[in-house]
Amino acid sequence: MRTIDKRIAPNVRLAATLVARAPALTLAYDARCKSRLAATLDTGEDVALVLPRGTVLRDGDVLVADDGALVRVAAAHEAVLLVRAPDALTLTRAAYHLGNRHTPVEVGAGCLKLEYDPALADMLTRLGATVERASAPFQPEAGAYGGGHRHGHDATFAEDYALAQQVFDEHHGHSHSHSHSHSHDHDHQHGPSCSHGHHHGHR
């Protein structure tokens, strides 16, 4: 069995014909978040995926097997919710509540897409949004500062915040004095109906 252990950086340009000839590895979003995976190429060949921990594959990524052969990643069709709203305010409110629950979301023109979840569908309907179940590829937003790893919401927030701070320091230097104190109280109850209470005090 061949092992796929490398991902070519997105900024590396490859000949289109070379990529087109590569066999596809079609995976749903949840599988694309796993760095260790037994998978099957579209050709029927079984392969082992062994990538650096924290890797999240995206549609169009190009991987390299241990024999040097290329494999291209394709996002599989899966059960999703398409969320639309009669006005921008309602759609923004829907996006806010999804973000508050740390739900992966793909943002489109006038539409939000997320993994199928009947509880979220009910919540969004109560907010005034129109929710449609569909089968489509799902490719949610990566972290705003490059953090796209799916470690759980606390790790993702910490990762993005650290990267944001790094970018700020690079642009503004390290000689600024900051007189901000932050108190964060998080009340997280994990389970089927995960509720999140966030209290942020800034002064």
From Swiss-Prot:
Subcellular location: Cytoplasm
Record Pfam families: UreE_C, UreE_N
CDD domains membership: UreE
Predominant location category: cytoplasm
Single GO MF annotation: nickel cation binding
Cited InterPro entries: UreE (IPR012406), UreE_C_dom (IPR007864), UreE_N (IPR004029), UreE_N_sf (IPR036118)
Keyword Transmembrane helix appears in the UniProt entry: no
Keyword Cytoplasm: yes
Protein origin, superkingdom: Bacteria
Leader sequence segment: none
Keywords from the named record: Chaperone, Cytoplasm, Nickel, Nickel insertion
Region (Disordered): 170-203
Family named by the database record: Belongs to the UreE family.
Function: Involved in urease metallocenter assembly. Binds nickel. Probably functions as a nickel donor during metallocenter assembly.
Protein name per UniProt: Urease accessory protein UreE
